[in-house]
Amino acid sequence: MRTMRSTLAVCTFLLALLTSDSAWAQDTAVQEAARRAEVIAHLPPEAAKVLFGREVAPTLGPAQAIGAYERGCLSGAVALPTDGPNWQVMRPSRNRAWGHPALITLLERVAAKLPSEADWPGLLVGDIAQPRGGPMLTGHGSHQIGLDADIWLTPMPGRRLSRPERDEISATAVVAADGMDIDPTSWTPQHRRLLETFAREPAVARIFVNAAIKRALCREAGADRAWLTKIRPWWGHNYHFHIRLSCPGGDPECRSQTPPPPGAGCGKELDWWFTEEALHPTPSLPGKPLRLTDLPRACAALAAPPTSQALSVRAGVQ
């Protein structure tokens, strides 16, 4: 009975955590630290997200994306520099600017051409992955193998933001309050061109956006609509979009998703996202937290056994 009550308490907490704030990605450093401490308090010390969440540096050696986007890890990660000519890393205190070199290289290259191709001054880059990938204490179900990245739907300003600003300011929502369409006061033609530029990259497998953004893109796209196939509607994503790369060649343990179905995705499959069922879904209880044994075997070597000292340190934000 005690075990059942304990399990129910954990599930109730995690459900509240998942449903209380649809804009969790905009949490400030203080809010993020509080969430992490609360999560750790409700999880067993051997939970995979606790073990990977406390790692502060990558492993040495060649890069390898191991496993699937939502169940894996990353060796040999590299960090996107905090500042670049056409990008700035946001929420740096989270220490989630690590990725597979294939993704980091793509972000730097696309950022460089956005001013001329999309009239977009530069990228504000959100979460990529932890230093060794793996499940995160807060936020994402994916972003585990260094091939996912969140990009803010806010253009880079004409100055360098301070570190406190990067941890505090919020991105701009481009979706109307009722979720039925974009907000015409914040959506611009440059947003479409930004998303199209990323979608035309061969290495990009999917781009997740709010369904209202997909609706706008379907309406605004020209005759060449092939790139719309990669634009996939998903809940949230009204402040940022989420790019996902296919598995790079030479990473034998990386598991790509099945490609999106053919077609622009602008028909009945998009209409469903504006039904009551999709707009106000009934929350489901989360499953049990992943353990190292739930991940590919190679991931066990990337996360050290739990210690009380490490858990205490990771309750804050690095």
What do the PLM-derived regions correspond to, one by one?
Residues 119-124, 145-149, 203, 237-241:
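Envelope-exposed proteins and targeting segments
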Residues 27-71:
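Solvent-exposed N-terminal domain segments of exported/luminal and surface proteins
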Residues 27-41, 161-318:
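Catalytic cores and adjacent binding grooves of peptidoglycan-active enzymes
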Residues 9-17:
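Hydrophobic helical h-region of N-terminal Sec-dependent signal peptides
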Residues 23-25:
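Boundary at the C-terminal end of the N-terminal hydrophobic targeting segment
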Residues 56-125, 187-196, 201-204:
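Active-site acidic/histidine clusters and adjacent loop/turn architecture
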Residues 53, 106-138, 208-230:
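Extended, low-complexity, intrinsically disordered C-terminal regulatory tails
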